[in-house]
Amino acid sequence: MICFNGFFKAFIMAAGYQETYQRSIQNAEDFWSEIANNIFWYKKPSKILNSDNPPFYKWFEDGTTNTCYNAVDLHVKNGKGEKIAIIYDSPITNSQKKITYSQLKEQVSIFAGALVNQGIKKGDRVIIYMPMIPEAVVAMLGCARIGAIHSVVFGGFAANELASRIDDSKTKIILSASCGYEPGRTIEYKPLLKKAIELAKHKPEKCIIYQRKDFKADLEKNEIDWNEFIKNAKPVECVEMNANDYAYIIYTSGTTGVPKGIVRDIGGHIVALKWTMKNIYNINPDDVWWSASDIGWIVGHSYIVYGPLFHGCTTVLFEGKPVGTPDAGVFWRIISEHKVKSLFTAPTAFRAIKKEDPNGEFFKKYNLSSFEFLFLAGERADPDTLKWAESLLKVPVIDHWWQTETSWAISANC
């Protein structure tokens, strides 16, 4: 049974659903115009929806804004600079790091300056092929700051898959790392990167390599050490972007065919994701949110990086696995230690935990009093796993559905 407190909170979340839903479909322009007032605009849009050429709709087409400004600078400007933006928790390397919004702004603006020094400008494409480390988030935001279009590829992805994305994007540079870590093994990125460039018809100008502490890669002539890359860079300001300019390219998972490159526009992306943090996930700016995914997938883009940072809350960046780093209690340890309010993950994670610890012995070791909601998506959530999670956690377990193509929930029991 779900505890009464959790059930009551779920009921309160759902109470306003019908009214909100009716407003959204009966007068979509007024609905989204009101919501759009919650983000920063250099120039507020005078036209909310252009439906002259269906199905190619345009939202906020004469508005101008910037993704990075809304994710970082705005919170510093509003006096929230000392608030924790990112909690990096890496059980696989036994390390943690907390980054405030002010620190994030400094790192991102300098990295963006380094990109500018390399000749990267608005509209250029940049591939990010990195593990789950803070530098990967800095790279994403650095691109967004100057209007470059990032294409994040899951770290350690096969060389032929990376090569196809190099050719598709015509990337100017690739941002990568010396390696990624899996339980019991190190995945060297350099050989994969080198092979991908050999396979690709398009050749990037440079590769910027972040050297992990315990594994250094040998660099070649077209490769630059990450720290050298940023050493003499000066911070740069955000570039004013049209709402229909492109934020990023991301590929579908390939579950229904050949992976497809999805291009995301800027304005609607910011407006929608910020709105979802409170209205679907019930997260407030003072809360800690955790999406246990990877930045190489849409869940990582939307709900590790952009959504929580647009909302000004704290997001957990997790480099590990549900089991094996070191055990099936790592999720409970992170929720307890960082006072996570809501967790978003895939059913596979809970199936793995259930298999390793069916009676929840690890769960019993931790205080999860901060924890209020579990959200599942990405694949079918089988009834046995749902019931097991509800019985163990005694909080609402909400299965919702969306796609890479949409970037946020299509169907959610909120």
Which residue stretches match the model-derived regions?
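N-lobe entry segment of adenylate-forming
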Residues: C3-I99, Q103-E106, I110-G113, L192, ...
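Conserved AMP-binding/adenylate-forming core of the ANL superfamily
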Residues: C68-Y69, I86-L141, A158, L162-A163, ...
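Conserved pre-ATP/AMP-binding loop-to-beta segment of ANL
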Residues: E82-I84, C207-Y210, E220-Y251, V258, ...
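Conserved adenylation A10 loop of the ANL superfamily
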Residues: T93-S95, I249-I262, M277
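Conserved structural elements of the adenylate-forming
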Residues: V108-S109, K231, I262-N282
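Structural core segment of the AMP-binding/adenylate-forming
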Residues: L141, R145-E228, P347
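Conserved AMP-binding/adenylation subdomain of ANL enzymes
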Residues: I270-V288, I298-S342, K355-E361
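Gly/Ser/Thr-rich phosphate-binding loop
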Residues: C313, K341-T345, K354-C414
